[in-house]
Curated annotation (Swiss-Prot):
GO MF annotation terms: thiazole synthase activity
Catalytic activity: [ThiS sulfur-carrier protein]-C-terminal-Gly-aminoethanethioate + 2-iminoacetate + 1-deoxy-D-xylulose 5-phosphate = [ThiS sulfur-carrier protein]-C-terminal Gly-Gly + 2-[(2R,5Z)-2-carboxy-4-methylthiazol-5(2H)-ylidene]ethyl phosphate + 2 H2O + H(+)
UniProt protein name: Thiazole synthase
Enzyme class: transferase
SUPFAM superfamilies in the record: ThiG-like
Active site residues per record: 107
Keywords per UniProt: Cytoplasm, Schiff base, Thiamine biosynthesis, Transferase
Primary localization class, coarse: cytoplasm
Gene name of the record: thiG
Keyword Cytoplasm: yes
EC numbers, comma separated: 2.8.1.10
Gene3D superfamilies, per database record: Aldolase class I
Family of this protein: Belongs to the ThiG family.
Species this chain originates from: Sulfurihydrogenibium sp. (strain YO3AOP1)
Length: 267
C-alpha cells in the first residue's frame, strides 16, 4: 500500500545542502495582512517563504513585522531582491538580508523591464557571480533560457528559477519545452517561478519533472487564499507523483481499456 507521508519524507527537495519536505515555495506579498500571510503559508505546507527585503519589514521591531507571524523553526525565510534594477542594488539588498536573518540564502532578482518584469540576465549574472564568491547560496530568477541556466550553474548557484510566464500574470506555463531543456542542461534544482494562476498550472509544471515551484499572486490574490493554498499544496504533490509514476504515451487513436478477446457474440 502506498504511504504518502513516507514518500514525502523520503522525496525531499535539497537546495544548498538544506532539505525541504515540501516542493512548494510561497511568496509573502499581496496579502491583506500578515495574519492572512501566516494562515495561507501554513495551509500550503510550504517550508520556505520569500520576502522582498526592500518592501516588507523584517528588521524594525517597532513596526508590525512578518517574522512575528512566521514560525521560522518550521518555515525558512528566503529573502529576495525584488525591486532591484542593477547588480549593485541586488548585492546590497542581499547583504542587508543576510545581516538581518543570519543566513546567506537569497532569491536573486534583478528586473530589466517594468512592464513585463522580465529579469535582466546580464545584471543578474553579474550579481550572482559576486554573491557566490561572498558565500551566499544564490537562487536566481531567470528567463527560460537553457544556455543561461547552465551559466548560472557553472558559477556556483544553488538552483535556477526560470519563469513560467510574467510575474503575476497567471498565464500558466507558456514554454514547456524550454523548461525541459533547462532541466536537461543543469544538475542543480530547477524551481519554476512566476506566472502560475491556479492549481492545474502547478500540477502541469511539476509533471515536467522540475524540482519545485514558487508562487505568490496565485494564492494571495485568489478569492479565498487559504483554500487556494491547500489546492496548491495538493497540486504540487499530484504533479510530482504523476511525473514519477510516468504518464502514458499520447496516441492519435483510441485504445480499448478492455481486451476484445472473449467478447460475447464474437468468435
Amino acid at each position: 500500500m502506498f504511504d504518502l507521508e513516507k514518500f514525502l519524507e523520503n522525496d525531499k527537495l535539497v537546495i544548498g545542502g538544506k532539505e525541504f519536505k515540501s516542493r512548494l515555495i510561497v511568496g509573502s506579498g499581496k496579502y491583506k495582512d500578515f495574519q492572512q500571510t501566516k494562515e495561507a503559508t501554513e495551509a500550503s505546507g510550504a517550508e520556505m517563504i520569500t520576502v522582498a527585503v526592500r518592501r516588507v519589514n523584517i528588521t524594525d521591531p517597532n513596526q508590525d513585522n512578518l517574522l512575528n507571524y512566521i514560525d521560522t523553526s518550521k518555515i525558512m525565510i528566503l529573502p529576495n531582491t525584488a525591486g532591484c534594477y542593477t547588480a549593485e542594488e541586488a548585492i546590497l539588498t542581499a547583504k542587508l538580508a543576510r545581516e538581518a536573518l543570519g543566513h546567506g540564502f537569497v532569491k536573486l532578482e534583478v528586473i530589466g523591464d517594468q512592464k513585463t518584469l522580465y529579469p535582466d540576465m546580464i545584471e543578474t549574472l553579474k550579481a550572482a557571480e559576486i554573491l557566490v564568491k561572498e558565500g551566499f547560496t544564490v537562487l536566481p530568477y531567470i528567463t527560460d533560457d537553457p544556455v543561461m541556466a547552465k551559466r548560472f550553474e557553472d558559477i556556483g548557484c544553488a538552483a535556477v528559477m526560470p519563469l513560467a510566464a510574467p510575474i503575476g500574470s497567471g498565464l500558466g506555463l507558456q514554454n514547456p519545452y524550454n523548461i525541459l531543456f533547462i532541466k536537461e542542461a543543469v544538475k542543480i534544482p530547477v524551481i519554476v517561478d512566476a506566472g502560475i494562476g491556479t492549481a492545474s498550472d502547478a500540477a502541469i509544471v511539476m509533471e515536467l519533472g522540475v524540482d519545485g515551484v514558487l508562487m505568490n499572486t496565485a494564492i494571495a490574490q485568489a478569492k479565498d487564499p487559504i483554500k487556494m493554498a491547500v489546492a496548491m499544496k495538493h497540486a504540487v504533490i499530484a504533479g510530482r507523483l504523476a511525473y514519477l509514476a510516468g504518464r502514458i504515451p499520447k496516441k492519435m487513436y483510441a485504445s480499448a481499456s478492455s481486451p476484445m478477446e472473449g467478447v460475447i457474440g464474437r468468435n
